Every structure is written in structure tokens, then in C-alpha cells.
Regions:
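Ser/Thr-glycine-rich phosphate-binding loops at phosphate-binding pockets of nucleotides
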Residues: 17-19, 128, 149-155, 222
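Hydrophobic residues embedded in beta-strands of well-ordered beta-sheets
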Residues: 20, 32, 153, 163-164
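N-terminal glycine-rich anion-binding loops that anchor highly charged ligand groups
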Residues: 32-44, 78
Length: 327
């Protein structure tokens, strides 16, 4: 273990397509702990930006407003010596991503780390691993990890210790909602067309699941948080992971596909930022379950930002430093 300060407080941001997430953590020589978590809507694809491949002015404004709120939380928490923002699909795929990164740096003084999809999948794996959910794997068994995002969906196959396969697919729900424009409730033909399209785009994943035969499916954060809140009526908040009974997931899907936005907003734990996308998320999850046939499905409350904290903590323990963009 390298020489280090006895304490360091860091802030990690996950700048997603629909939501910006903040996690503040304290590093001590023998452990780390979470101090503060905050999230707010950002809608980087607003105004048709996903379809045009650009972060449009309305999205710039929304993102800056979200970052202002996040920076206020960081300042109010105090003692943060490092801020590490990770940007994912909406920023990395935008033609004007460099312009966005420069604008954020100029206004807030933070340097955004725009990460590729495979790196995103790696951090998601580390976050899910930190949740402890892999204790449900027996020796020789594998798990399929899935993170449903706004711009992309990440998949990882793991034995609980190492990554056997990882891939990011540009099939995020904000992207799919633009592609499959429909009036509510979603019609059977549109639902089948959506499932068929996703199935064809995931051919490589199906080959890998046939090869590694994962026995459990773990969905992280985002849509799976909403699934958990629906099934458990917003209970079990303190648990880093929970099992989502397959029969209840199926029943929930049947409710979702028949619902309209006003009905979904009355459902337990429904976030306004997810109300337009949760139907497709549910259909996508059912497609994966049908194809993979896991014996159990779990929700992990830990994902990219928790994985980033775990990784930065290990670096701090080994080297005594975390990163270059210190405040």
C-alpha cells in the first residue's frame, strides 16, 4: 500500500443520456463509504438530438442546469478533493461532443472523461460486483449483466470474478423510442417489431450466452430500479441488490404494455424521466429473459458510478493518488 492521506473525499458523475448521477464517497485506508447520492434529469437527446447525432441547444441548456444542481450538492457536501465525470453514449456518439466537453469545462471547471462502450461495461461490472450479488453464483456458474440506458445498453458475462464477455449496443431506450414512434398504449405490431429488431441486433450476444450459459440475469440501476420499486412498492431501499421474481416481472410487463403515461406516473417509484421509456425497457427485458432463460433475475442498485468509486479507491490504495483532475 502506498503512502497516502488518511482520508480523501471524491465525487463521481455518471452523465447518462437521460439522467445525470452523482455519488460522493469517502476513502479511508481500510474501506470506502458512500456519503451522498443525487440524480437529476438531463435529457441529452432532447429536441431530436439522438436522431440527428448532435447535442442540440435545448439539451445543452438542460445539461448545464443539471450540472449546476450537481455542483451545488458537491459544494454543500464540502471537502471534495476530486471530481471525475464519466460521459457515455449521448456524448460519445454526438458529432459535437468535443464542443460539449469544452463548454462544460469552461463553465464548471471539470474535465469530462468520455468513455467508450466497452469501458462503460467494465465499470458497470465493477459496480455490480461491489453489490455482492455474485454470492448467488455457485462455482462454475456464470451471470449475464445488463444495463439498459438511454443511448446504449451494456452487457457483460462473468463468472463473478472476471469478465468473459462485454459489449455495448446502441439500443438505448431513448434511441429506440425515437426509432419506434408510437401512440399509447403500444400496439402489438409495434411491440413485435421492436422485439424483432432488438433480437436481430443482439446476434453476437445470443452466441455468447449460448457459449457461456449464464444462470442468472442481473439488471443494474436505471430501469431495473423502477422494476424493483414497482414489485416491492418502493421498499428495500437499503439493499444493494434484490431478487425480482420472474412471475412478477412477467405480470409487470403485462401491465406496462397496456398502460399510458398518466397511468404509469401513478405507479410506485415511477420517475418522470423514465415514464416514456419504461414500456420499451420492459419489453427489452422480457426479450432477454425469453432468450437466455435464467433461473433467477436480480436488480443491482450499484452500476457505473459505484464501479468507478471501487476502481478509484483501489488506485488510491495502490498509488496514493486518484486522478489528475483535482479541484
Amino acid at each position: 500500500m502506498a503512502d497516502m492521506d488518511s482520508h480523501k473525499r471524491i465525487a463521481v458523475m455518471d452523465l447518462g443520456t437521460n439522467v445525470f448521477n452523482l455519488l460522493i464517497a469517502d476513502f479511508l485506508p481500510d474501506k470506502y463509504s458512500f456519503v451522498k447520492e443525487f440524480k437529476c434529469a438531463a435529457r441529452l437527446g432532447a429536441g431530436g438530438g439522438i436522431k440527428t447525432g448532435r447535442i442540440l441547444p435545448v439539451a445543452f441548456g438542460s445539461a448545464k442546469e443539471a450540472l449546476s444542481k450537481i455542483m451545488q450538492v458537491i459544494n454543500e457536501t464540502g471537502e471534495v478533493s476530486l471530481i471525475h465525470p464519466y460521459a457515455t453514449s449521448a456524448v460519445r456518439d454526438a458529432d459535437n461532443s468535443a464542443e460539449f466537453v469544452t463548454a462544460v469545462n469552461g463553465e464548471f471547471g471539470i474535465s469530462i472523461d468520455v468513455i467508450p462502450g466497452e469501458r462503460e461495461a467494465e465499470l458497470i461490472f465493477k459496480g455490480i460486483k461491489a453489490s455482492g450479488v455474485f454470492c448467488n453464483l455457485k462455482n462454475g456458474e456464470n451471470a449475464l449483466l445488463m444495463d439498459i440506458g438511454g443511448g446504449s445498453n451494456e452487457f457483460v458475462i462473468t463468472d463473478g470474478h472476471s469478465v468473459l464477455y462485454k459489449r455495448s449496443f446502441p439500443l438505448g431506450m431513448a434511441r429506440m423510442r425515437e426509432k419506434f414512434n408510437y401512440s399509447e398504449p403500444i400496439g402489438k405490431e409495434v411491440a413485435e417489431e421492436f422485439a424483432g429488431y432488438c433480437y436481430s441486433q443482439l446476434n453476437e450476444l445470443w452466441q455468447m450466452t449460448e457459449r457461456y450459459k449464464p444462470v442468472i440475469l442481473v439488471g443494474s440501476s436505471g430501469s431495473f430500479d423502477t422494476f424493483k420499486d414497482y414489485i416491492y412498492n418502493c421498499g428495500l431501499k437499503e439493499k444493494p441488490y434484490v431478487e425480482l421474481p420472474l412471475d412478477e416481472l412477467m405480470a409487470m410487463n403485462n401491465v406496462m404494455v397496456k398502460s399510458v403515461a398518466a397511468e404509469r406516473m401513478r405507479m410506485p417509484g415511477m420517475s418522470p424521466v423514465r415514464v416514456d421509456f419504461i414500456v420499451l425497457s420492459s419489453l427489452f427485458t422480457q426479450l432477454v429473459i425469453k432468450q437466455v432463460n435464467p433461473k433467477a433475475v436480480y436488480q443491482s442498485g450499484y452500476s457505473l458510478k459505484e464501479g468507478a468509486v471501487a476502481e478509484l479507491y483501489e488506485k488510491w490504495r495502490e498509488t496514493g493518488c486518484v486522478a489528475d483532475n483535482l479541484l
